[in-house]
Amino acid sequence: MAGAFIAAAVLATAITTPALAANNNQPDHIFFIMMENHGTNQIIGNTADAPFINQLANRYGVATNYHGVTHPSLPNYLAAISGDFQGIWDDCKAGPLVTCAPEEFVPGAGDASDPTFSAYTDPHSPQFGAVPPQLTPAQIASSSSTPHWFAGQTIVDQLEAKGLSWKAYMQSIPFAGADVEFYPTVGTTFYKLYAQKHNPFLYFSNIRGSASRMANIVPLPQLEYDLATGNAPNFVWISPDQCSDMHGVGNGNPLGYPTCSYPASGLDHGAIQLGDAFLRQTVTKIMNSSVWSENSIIVIAWDEDDYGGYPTGCCGSPTGSKGSQSAVLGGALAPAIVVRRGVPAHRQSSHPYNHYSVLGTIQHLWNLPCLANTCSLSTADLMLDLFGNGSDN
């Protein structure tokens, strides 16, 4: 299946994982797996479609008030590694000359960020009459003219400055550092298993301009090799492809995954089941590897609730207008689960969190500087209630 690891006869450049001091809060490895486009109530409690995810949620840490930073996908991914959504509301490809008009918080978006969305106009809908926030004219103009080639720092800069290793593992990317928007293609048709919008590293000029950094953006099968050989880096980013991250594609039949196709209506049970199977396989491989004998953490988060949830937000989400008032342009409630070795008790937090909260917590645990919106987080705003404080290990 698309979510499977290929048996790894993969040539790898060994990464030396720095030894971290014992008896402190610093984890040896943090794995961040980003899933797609579902609300908390579609996943947590849905044991029929997502049994493995719910096993994790019932055993480890779960955030019940976690939000996407905004809509759509790309700005959430940018926020997760840079502390800033970079002022865009689109999913366009990377490039110094690439600019795009906003796809969200404008009429025609076609989802819960759209003021003409059926949920707000249908008298039988519980959200009938609700008005979502919208972009201001100034925000539309600024976003439409912003090149998708960002010069700011990311967690990559911070990790390297600290002597910590990192890799980004991308399922279905054709080769390390590939500059393609979608993959694979057959003739002129894109099948979009790999989508560049889920690879935020390619949008930053100081990563694109570095051969060594581009070499760290690798196909997912490399992870199995790195785990088996003890070469897993300190920070591991994992982007499943669109048939494994619960996003889905327009037509999964040519790929051999009909349940990956968008449903005509209702909940996309097939996409959730594929994502649950991917996480079962991937998380199990991590937990069965030697890295799990060390002080390690797995974070599983969904980028946003793209279709069903009113666009609530928190913790530095941008604001737009709602009539004469300002209002949050959030990414709605989405699931987030934290698995930490040595923290056995189930933990549940209703504290408001988002992707900035995850990044800020990682920075805190590794004594890294803050970035952009993570600089506004107090210690009380960090996810230490779910990540644990190190004394439990």
Give the residues covered by each predicted segment:
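Bacterial N-terminal signal peptides
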Residues: 2-14
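Intrinsically disordered, low-complexity Ser/Thr/Pro-rich tracts
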Residues: 13-21
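N-terminal pro-sequences and low-complexity stem/linker regions of secreted or lumenal proteins
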Residues: 20-393
